[in-house]
Regions:
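TM-lumen/periplasm interface segments of multi-pass membrane proteins
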Residues: 1-109, 128
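Transmembrane and membrane-interface helices of multi-pass
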Residues: 105-125
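Multi-pass, polyprenyl lipid-linked donor-dependent membrane glycosyltransferases
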Residues: 125-139
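Hydrophobic alpha-helical transmembrane segments
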Residues: 66, 81-82, 113-118, 138
Length: 139
């Protein structure tokens, strides 16, 4: 029963928001391109990177390019799924932390965060961050 209710709670906001859509996560491809350039010994900042039919600069510090190297070593789909799962997990963890501080008397912060997570995922800033493959949640 609990699993059924949790499933409805998880899917309902997504359906209200328009249902499934696959979007090209352009930002993650910029991160991957910068990391690949670093691996090739190229200057990160003297060129643009062709992603999604446009040219974008790498605007992050060199340390970021080093941290993005694992993304450059795997196919786009693997990088995207890994990045998205990490973002969702960290968003959940942020919800747990906020609940612990905002409502310390609640019995199970992790379970409540799990119930809140689907609603947080369809909030415009979070939905767009994940849709574009941005780094915001991971920071």
């Amino acid at each position: 029963m609990i699993a059924a209710v949790a499933s409805v709670v998880a899917v309902l906001p997504w359906l209200i928001d328009g249902g499934p859509s696959i979007r090209y996560a352009i930002d993650i491809d910029v991160y991957r391109a910068g990391a690949a350039a670093l691996l090739d010994g190229d200057n990160l900042y003297t060129r643009g990177y062709e992603v999604g039919g446009i040219t974008l600069p790498f605007t992050y510090p060199p340390l970021a390019a080093m941290l993005f190297i694992p993304l450059a070593l795997v196919p786009y789909a693997v990088a995207l799924v890994t990045w998205t799962l990490a973002s969702v997990l960290l968003l959940w963890w942020c919800l747990v932390i906020v609940l612990r501080h905002a409502a310390p008397r609640l019995a199970d912060h992790r379970m409540i965060a799990t119930w809140i997570l689907p609603f947080a995922l369809v909030a415009e800033p979070v939905r767009e961050t994940i849709g574009f493959g941005q780094i915001n949640i991971l920071l």
